C-alpha cells in the first residue's frame, strides 16, 4: 500500500520542513486546515462544483489517430489538461488552494510563477473569490511570457519582476517565500507545484490527482485495459504526480521527462534527477542541480515552466525506489515534437508538454500497434507562440515556400 507522505511530511528520505522558525506556525496552520477539510463532504462538494462548472472538468482523453498512423507504432492517447479554463493543469490546484485560503479566513494570495500558467491560475481564482493577489516572476520569464504577464494584470493581480539570480522560477520562489514570512497573518502562499516544505507537496498532489483518476477511468472505458506506459513532463512535477498517482500501484510503466536544454552534458539544462544530487531547496530535501560546494547551478530550458533546479520530493522518492523512470529531452527535440503534434492533430501543446510528447513519440515508434502510450498534455501552447516565432519562423516560412514550389 503506497501511503506517502508520512506524518513528518517525508516521502522516504525526501521532503520534510526545512524552514525558519517564523514559518513553522503558518505551515502547521495550513496542514491542520487541509487535513480537516480534505475529507469534508461540504468542502469536496464545493471544490468539485468549481472543477466542473468553472474549469470544465473532466477534461477529454483524445486518441491521436493521425499521429499514431504517422509514427507507425503504439497507440498514443492524450490527457487534455490544455482544455482546462486558463489553458493548463495549474487551475486544478489553484481552485483547491483558494478554497482552502478562503476557509482559513485569508484575504490575499501570494504566488510564484515560471511559465506564467500558475500565476494566471492564481490571478484567476483570486478574481473569482474576491481576493487580492501578488505574483512573483523572474525577469527572464517576464520577457519570455509577456502574454501571461498581461493576462495576470488584466485579472487584477500585481506582478513583481524578480531580478536576482538568473531571473527565473527559483528566484521568484525565493522572493515569494521572503514576502510570505513578512505577511503570513493575512496572506496565503499558493505554491504552484509539488515542491516546497510539507504540507505543500502533499496538498498540491491531492489537488492534481483527478488528472490520473479521470484518465485511468476514461482509458479503461475505451480500451477495457490500462495503458502500457504513462508519460508526463517534470519541472517541479505537479502534472506528473497528478497523472502518476492513479497508476502507482498498477503494473504500468511510468516515465517522467525533464528538460535537457542544450544537452545534459552541457551546463545548459534543467535535468534535476538525471544530473542532480541530494540537497535542500525551498524547505524540502530533494535532488537539485548544485556544484561540489552545494551552490545551486542555474538551470536552463527553452521552457519557462521546466527550468527549476529542484524537483518535488515525491519524484525524488519515486526515482530512488525505481517506480518511475526519469529521462530527459532537449529543446530541439521538444520543439520538433510540438510541431509534429500541431501539424498532425491540430493541437498546439505547451513547450513543457512537448518534452513529454517527444519521449512518448520515441517510445511509441518502438512498440507494436496493440500497445498504448498515455501522455499528459499539461497545457496549451498559446503562451509560447512568441518564443516559437523566434525559433521557428524562418523554418516554417521555408516549409511553406517549398510546398508552394512543389504545387507549381
Curated annotation (Swiss-Prot):
GO terms for cellular component: cytoplasm. InterPro entries: Trp_synth_b_CS (IPR006653), Trp_synth_beta (IPR006654), Trp_synth_beta/beta-like (IPR023026), TrpB-like_PALP (IPR001926), TrpB-like_PALP_sf (IPR036052). The gene is trpB. The lineage of its organism: Bacteria, Bacillati, Bacillota, Bacilli, Bacillales. Keywords: Amino-acid biosynthesis, Aromatic amino acid biosynthesis, Lyase, Pyridoxal phosphate, Tryptophan biosynthesis. It is an enzyme of class 4 (lyase). Tetramer of two alpha and two beta chains. GO terms for molecular function: tryptophan synthase activity. It catalyses: (1S,2R)-1-C-(indol-3-yl)glycerol 3-phosphate + L-serine = D-glyceraldehyde 3-phosphate + L-tryptophan + H2O. The beta subunit is responsible for the synthesis of L-tryptophan from indole and L-serine. It comes from the Bacteria. The keyword DNA-binding does not apply. It holds the Pfam family PALP. Its cofactor is pyridoxal 5'-phosphate. This is Tryptophan synthase beta chain. PANTHER family: TRYPTOPHAN SYNTHASE, TRYPTOPHAN SYNTHASE-RELATED. HAMAP family: Trp_synth_beta (MF_00133). The keyword Ribosomal protein does not apply. The modification N6-(pyridoxal phosphate)lysine is found at residue 90. Belongs to the TrpB family. It comes from Bacillus licheniformis (strain ATCC 14580 / DSM 13 / JCM 2505 / CCUG 7422 / NBRC 12200 / NCIMB 9375 / NCTC 10341 / NRRL NRS-1264 / Gibson 46).
